[in-house]
């Protein structure tokens, strides 16, 4: 049951030195990477690999901690750099026991940077740990890496701090949950009078729970539906408010980082 390594690649407008600073400086790295709550570099000799401690908050006041070491390889005259790392944890809440990977930086002729990572790890807790990793943890970790890379891109390109996106993303999730519950309620109530209408409304409720690629289309269609209800003259204020709410949340979704803007498979 060997799993494929996690691979993420993104292109952004930047120069080599700037991107290197944003990713190799621990005080900046922890700001954009969802995988880490804190990164602390330990004292080391110039000829040694840089050792570090990391922490990740997992909720309910709990943290997972681990250690690692990294080394950067670059030539001032080259348009490429790389950074390798090894990491591990003996924390009882950590599903990762040890792993390794690398970051690679490639300066393109069009003034853009290609930033990519690939890493692999071994899990704890035997067969149970491997199944949890396969079904839940690895997909979530891959998504978090990809989302973080796009958050980094927006920070570098537009100077928008990643913490702002995290708050906005939480708000957006609650918006989607609100619309989903709204249509579930409408669907289960409406199915008594019209099975077709009730089923369609329940289907729309399910769509709000899915990570769809072009979800802004649903926002737009829903805003038009609410506006149409308002034109019918019944509870005008409520429908207008819901229409504006739907359009505003759609606009918000277009400004958020997205894992879909990254490449998750290496070119053959």
Curated annotation (Swiss-Prot):
It is found in: Cell membrane. Its main location: membrane. Keywords: Cell membrane, Membrane, Transmembrane, Transmembrane helix. The chain crosses the membrane at residues 169-189, 190-210, 225-245. GO terms for cellular component: plasma membrane. The gene is yndG. This is Uncharacterized membrane protein YndG. Signal peptide: none annotated. It is a multi-pass membrane protein.
């Amino acid at each position: 049951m060997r799993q494929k390594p996690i691979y993420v690649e993104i292109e952004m407008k930047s120069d080599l030195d700037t991107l290197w600073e944003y990713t190799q400086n621990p005080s900046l790295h922890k700001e954009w990477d969802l995988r880490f709550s804190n990164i602390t570099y330990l004292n080391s000799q110039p000829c040694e690999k840089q050792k570090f401690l990391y922490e990740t908050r997992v909720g309910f006041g709990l943290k997972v901690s681990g250690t690692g070491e990294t080394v950067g390889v670059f030539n001032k005259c080259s348009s490429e750099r790389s950074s390798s790392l090894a990491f591990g944890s003996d924390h009882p809440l950590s599903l990762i026991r040890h792993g390794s990977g690398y970051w690679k930086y490639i300066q393109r002729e069009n003034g853009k940077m290609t930033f990519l990572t690939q890493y692999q790890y071994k899990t704890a807790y035997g067969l149970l740990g491997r199944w949890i990793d396969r079904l839940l943890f690895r997909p979530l970790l891959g998504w978090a890496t990809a989302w973080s890379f796009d958050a980094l891109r927006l920070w570098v390109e537009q100077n928008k701090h990643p913490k702002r996106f995290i708050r906005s993303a939480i708000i957006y999730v609650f918006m989607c949950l609100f619309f989903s519950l709204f249509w579930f309620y409408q669907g289960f109530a409406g199915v008594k009078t019209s099975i077709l209408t009730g089923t369609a409304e329940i289907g729309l409720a399910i769509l709000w729970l899915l990570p769809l690629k072009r979800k802004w289309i649903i926002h737009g269609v829903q805003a038009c539906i609410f506006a149409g209800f308002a034109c019918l003259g019944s509870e005008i204020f409520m429908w207008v408010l819901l229409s504006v709410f739907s359009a505003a949340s759609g606009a918000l979704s277009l400004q958020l980082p997205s894992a879909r803007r990254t490449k998750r498979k290496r070119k053959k």
